[in-house]
Amino acid sequence: MSENSSPKLESTSAAAASTKKPFPEWIKPKGKETELLINNSLTGGKVPFVFNESGKGRSLTWYACGPTVYDASHMGHARTYISFDIIRRIMKNYLGFNIQYVMNITDIDDKIIIRANENGISHSDLSKKWETAFFEDMKLLNVLPPDALTRVTEYVPQIVEYVEKIISNGFAYESNGSVYFDTVAFSKAHDYGKLEPNSVGNEKLAAEGEGSLTATSAVSEKRSGFDFALWKKSKPGEPVWNSPWGEGRPGWHIECSAMASDLLGGNIDIHSGGSDLKFPHHDNELAQSEAFYGNRQWINYFVHSGHLLIDGLKMSKSLKNFITIKQALEKYTSRQMRMFFILHKYDKAMNYSPESMGYAIEMEKTFVEFFHTAKQILRDSPLSLPQFWTQAEKDLNKHLQNANDQVHQFILDNFNTSDALKTLSDLVNKTNVYIRSCAEQKTNPRLNLISAIAEYITYIFSVFGLTESSTASSMIGFGSAGKGNIEEEMTPILNALTQFRSEVRASAIAKDTTSILKTCDNLRDEVLPLLGVKIDDKSATTAMWKFEDKETLKKEIEQKKEIEKKKQADKEEKEKKLKEKFEKSKIPPQQLFINETDKYSKFNELGMPTHDKEGVEITKSQLKKLQKEYDNQTKEHNNYLKSLSTSTSSPTLTSTQSPQ
């Protein structure tokens, strides 16, 4: 470190690490204050959301840190992008904001260069491949695309201009073809490390932020060890762009500052990203942008998603718990994964495990069954039935109104979807109690009340993105994706019905009732689920049909087949062991050890081993074990002989024997 280093940037010592530094002053935006509270990483707590409505109505700007595309997207990405997709939908579809949502793609970086060289392909081919895969994953997860997408490789001229301006403002310098941000000069006029003040001076984090191709070689070029690269001089084999400082490439942190500023300007309402990016990436973004604009606050609200643990551990390939989004979707549906994230607060650490996913799946089933029940009531009960409200209906309606108020307050409290969803679950439980009570008293549930509850829950689910497509206000339930014309929708169902009719007719003509039943079961278990229809047998002669998500039903079929496959394998293994045991019972005890010459060399008159293969006498402890095995064989062989004497065709089986 040079002698110009500021005390604010000295290496973090044990004493300094133990003292929590305060957050710098946050400037409350001018404008209309709302009831919405947001956990702002710039303050370390919840603050009211304020937006400037002059001339633009309820509009806001939002910049989201996108992925560095060098590998498959994993569950950590799902955690971040689903969480912020939910918040974006809430702010747009529930709170009524018009959002300009910009996300970047880092398509040139140290990690990309290293991976491309390892694979022997160009960095552009590698990044294009994984960018395509990323957006395929986002589509499968029902994550809305950004309004504008910024790729680093398409913004290099703007990045160069941005760096030039920072240099001219006195906060960056050129050194050996690279350009570095002057943290010492900046710290004299601004607050550096707004998001994580305690991480300022952490050499390890600072080095990680520079990238593995740069961190070590650049130390001697910097005025301070904590300065970071805005422009990197390219080494042989690295991509290059022209600049006033020679051929090179952008640094990691400057990319977001330049691209976000180009589209959203010098003051942005919301910036989002994962917690692991706070320092140095996001703190460096803030510093660069303030240095460029000469202002004190580039971002008004910085929001971060919490860490995702896998079975309580940090996800890594070395621990063999690295789970890609596609791998997760092989086991769970997109809706189940979103339900899982909704059940957790977006800004807190969470644990991904079979148990936690199991809870989300059970929660989903609760709502699925409720929607089926509500639809059946509305479908089968005419409005001509009594609709007078008794105290039971008044009480249930009160629960609906309370749930509406509570969900609203939870949403305003830092997007608390977890408690909002539990409130809806409680409303469903109360509604189910009411429906059962009606059945017991032989009265009909009041249709408009059931419809109002189901439609309200559906509306909140559409806000959270749990419905795969826009669900009309008159619709209830999760809905389904891809609503085409009637012919497109009915064709696969009519094909299945036609095939079913042909098979039943053929079996009926052949008077094969067993085949007819098998065809009916196949329709229920194999054909209709793939069309999004589930049939539940209520009795030997009646059944109830339900519309359900195709992927959910498909996975249920797969899970059922896996269970049956395991049962069959266990059965075969058990039969195999019984058969082996039975075959062994045919051997007289005197011959049990005789052929084991690889273990023993001498035997007594009963066939018991007396010496091992080396000619050493068997020890007493070994002899005791062999005697026990010998006695057991005597018992099994006697049972075998007894079975021969009582049967002339095949041995009578005992609990210790098996058929041949």
Curated annotation (Swiss-Prot):
On cofactor binding, the record's note says: Binds 1 zinc ion per subunit.
Q: Detail which positions bind ATP.
A: K317
Which stretches does UniProt call biased (Low complexity)?
Answer: 643-660
- Can you tell me which residues bind Zn(2+)? C65, C256, H281, E285
Q: Which CDD domains match?
A: CysRS_core (cd00672)
Motif 'HIGH' region: where?
A: 67-77
Query: Per UniProt, which keywords does this protein have?
Result: Aminoacyl-tRNA synthetase, ATP-binding, Cytoplasm, Ligase, Metal-binding, Nucleotide-binding, Protein biosynthesis, Zinc
Q: Which domain of life is it from?
A: Eukaryota
In the Enzyme Commission scheme, what number(s) does this protein have? 6.1.1.16
Q: Where is this region: Disordered?
A: 1-20, 563-584, 627-660
Q: Where is this motif: 'KMSKS' region?
A: 314-318
Which residues pair up as cystines? none
Family stated for the protein in its record: Belongs to the class-I aminoacyl-tRNA synthetase family.
PANTHER family, A to Z: CYSTEINE--TRNA LIGASE, CYTOPLASMIC, CYSTEINYL-TRNA SYNTHETASE
Name assigned to this protein: Cysteine--tRNA ligase, cytoplasmic
- Origin organism of this chain? Dictyostelium discoideum
